[in-house]
Amino acid sequence: MANKTNSADDSYETPSGPSIKVRNLRVNYGEREILHSISFEVPAGETMVILGGSGSGKSTLLRTLVGLEKPTAGEIWMGDKNFAALTDAERDTLRKKMGMSFQGGALFGAMTVGENVALPLHEHTNLEQSTIEIMVRLKLDQVGLSGFENYMPAQLSGGMKKRAAIARAMAMDPEILFFDEPSAGLDPIIAAGIDELILKVKKVYRITIVVVTH
């Protein structure tokens, strides 16, 4: 597994996202060791791309970083908090500052695009519906899907589903964004557009981003 960090041209601006520090991370499934002594650091406001082939453990690493898997050993620092050592309640609070775009988009097929984007806002805030609707339109506009609030996911192309998933990941104005195979299954031109969108999000919001890809 390899990784690299990309520096932004506007690095003189103060980043809003925290740094991520992973120290000697191990994840076992029974007797099988999936991750062995993984260590890396993502500076605040920077982007790291984690590269690995199928079965290399990169998706397990991502799930562990967002708290969906518990590490067998090691530390995961998000700013000044060791995410791996927090209680479930503390982890849930910190997770609200994260956005996650899953492979394939993971949109709920029975909900409209707007309802999908609004879901985190309904679950984690007490905002009025009118305010949520404004925020949904704003997020969709930012990813190039203005006017698609009432579309169903089945009506979208693969690239549009990815954009809608990014809008949902951005709904809570996260400090950290995680992407799992954001351009998987897309043709090169559409994939390049998704990559450009991720770079745009990073430049505009100066947040910390981790991308897993192959």
Walk through the language-model features, giving the residues of each.
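Helix-to-loop junction immediately C-terminal to a conserved catalytic motif
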Residues: 66
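Conserved ABC ATPase "signature" region
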Residues: 81-82, 129-148, 199
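Short coil-to-helix segment of the ABC ATPase nucleotide-binding domain corresponding to the Q-loop/switch region
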Residues: 111-119
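Conserved ABC ATPase signature
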Residues: 152-156, 160
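Conserved catalytic motifs of ABC-family nucleotide-binding domains
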Residues: 173
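Catalytic Walker B motif of ABC-type/P-loop ATPase nucleotide-binding domains
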Residues: 177-180
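Helix N-cap at the start of a conserved alpha-helix in ABC-type nucleotide-binding domains
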Residues: 188-190
